[in-house]
Amino acid sequence: MFEDKRERPRTLHELCEALNVSMHNIQVVCVYCKKELCRADVYNVAFTEIKIVYRDNNPYAVCKQCLLFYSKIREYRRYSRSVYGTTLEAITKKSLYDLSIRCHRCQRPLGPEEKQKLVDEKKRFHEIAGRWTGQCANCWQRTRQRNETQV
């Protein structure tokens, strides 16, 4: 489909433009389970800014179930260290707001408010596979609810 590697769309929005299809009608297959993504998964790929990958010149994305599963596997296999926000700024010599940090669970990019909340709550940032991660507000809320109901 896309033989020239330089012209391959890297995001779902770019893929929709290249195929002249709306995001509501695009059909993409999961790179892991090979099932077609449902609408919610397609919107999740767009919202989390996950890159499109290619196998045999065909575009693939990732479904939510595989994303969560392989994010956990990646965390177990490739975890390096955890540091507080001030330490991370000292290590990288950059402000947290200038760093690209994703949620280690759902891979969504963290916004400035989420980064600040992690600092305020004295939560750590994690280096996994050479990239810095934290926890987004959505995943944080889920863990809090799960922990509070287990009492």
Swiss-Prot record:
Molecular-function annotations in GO: DNA binding; PDZ domain binding; zinc ion binding
UniProt similarity note: Belongs to the papillomaviridae E6 protein family.
Signal sequence bounds: none
Protein name, entry field: Protein E6
ZnF bounds (unnamed): 30-66, 103-139
Coiled coil: none
Chain ranges passing through the membrane: none
Protein's cellular compartments: Host cytoplasm; Host nucleus
InterPro entries cross-referenced by the UniProt entry: E6 (IPR001334), E6_sf (IPR038575)
Residue ranges annotated as motif PDZ-binding domain: 149-151
Keyword Zinc: yes
Note: Belongs to the high risk human alphapapillomavirus family. The cancer-causing human papillomavirus E6 protein has a unique carboxy terminal PDZ domain containing substrate.
Taxonomic placement: Viruses, Monodnaviria, Shotokuvirae, Cossaviricota, Papovaviricetes
Function of the protein: Plays a major role in the induction and maintenance of cellular transformation. Acts mainly as an oncoprotein by stimulating the destruction of many host cell key regulatory proteins. E6 associates with host UBE3A/E6-AP ubiquitin-protein ligase, and inactivates tumor suppressors TP53 and TP73 by targeting them to the 26S proteasome for degradation. In turn, DNA damage and chromosomal instabilities increase and lead to cell proliferation and cancer development.
Keyword Mitochondrion: no
Cross-referenced Pfam families: E6
GO biological process, one term: symbiont-mediated suppression of host cytoplasmic pattern recognition receptor signaling pathway via inhibition of IRF3 activity
GO cellular component: host cell cytoplasm; host cell nucleus
Subunit structure comment from the entry: Forms homodimers. Interacts with ubiquitin-protein ligase UBE3A/E6-AP and thus forms a complex with human TP53. Interacts with human NFX1 and MAGI3. Interacts with human IRF3; this interaction inhibits the establishment of antiviral state. Interacts with human TYK2; this interaction inhibits JAK-STAT activation by interferon alpha. Interacts with host DLG1; this interaction leads to the proteasomal degradation of DLG1.
Keywords: Activator, DNA-binding, Early protein, Host cytoplasm, Host nucleus, Host-virus interaction, Inhibition of host innate immune response by virus, Inhibition of host IRF3 by virus, Inhibition of host RLR pathway by virus, Metal-binding, Modulation of host cell apoptosis by virus, Oncogene, Transcription, Transcription regulation, Viral immunoevasion, Zinc, Zinc-finger
